[in-house]
């Protein structure tokens, strides 16, 4: 419990200033999410062979280029990314077509998330606060409902401590508090 509280406080300290002041701080926050998410997602690859060292930085850089580019270039740039990542297996045995598709999925997903976040933020900053409050309400309620009422495991293979009761409690309180 102490770890959860410390983590929550650190997240609050890191997220609130960018949301309040905007500008380059919000760009830095989005950059952090792109890099952290990229590392997490690209590490999902089965470790049968190590990728060439340039792959992960190239995929992360591709997301930044897309986010910062002119909207008219997005389709062409996504096409170039697909071509590049699906061509790499021709030149190395350590990177396969399925790895290329994983990189393309990462680039597309995080580009879309970053664009959506920026659009929501530019439309009305209060929407971002709404999303944060709903997320924390859902997560906190799920934790406590699962801890005190949880009897039926949700999916032990994915997360051994998650319960149906916690999941339903999280959904309910997330909806009520948002």
List PLM regions with ranges.
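Membrane-embedded alpha-helical bundles of polytopic integral membrane proteins
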Residues: 1-163, 167-178
């Amino acid at each position: 419990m102490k770890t959860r509280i410390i983590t929550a406080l650190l997240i609050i300290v890191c997220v609130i200033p960018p949301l309040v002041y905007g500008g380059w701080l919000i760009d830095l926050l989005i950059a952090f999410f792109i890099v952290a998410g990229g590392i997490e997602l690209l590490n999902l690859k089965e470790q049968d062979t190590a990728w060439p060292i340039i792959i992960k930085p190239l995929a992360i850089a591709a997301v930044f280029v897309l986010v910062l580019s002119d909207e008219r270039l997005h389709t062409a740039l996504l096409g170039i990314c697909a071509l590049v990542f699906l061509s790499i297996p021709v030149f190395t045995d350590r990177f396969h077509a399925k790895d290329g598709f994983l990189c393309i999925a990462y680039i597309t997903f995080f580009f879309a998330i970053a664009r959506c976040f920026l659009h929501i933020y530019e439309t009305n900053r209060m929407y971002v606060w709404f999303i944060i409050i709903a997320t924390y309400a859902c997560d906190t309620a799920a934790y406590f409902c699962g801890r005190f009422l949880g009897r039926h495991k949700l999916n032990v293979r994915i997360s051994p401590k998650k319960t149906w009761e916690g999941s339903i409690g999280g959904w309910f309180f997330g909806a009520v508090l948002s």
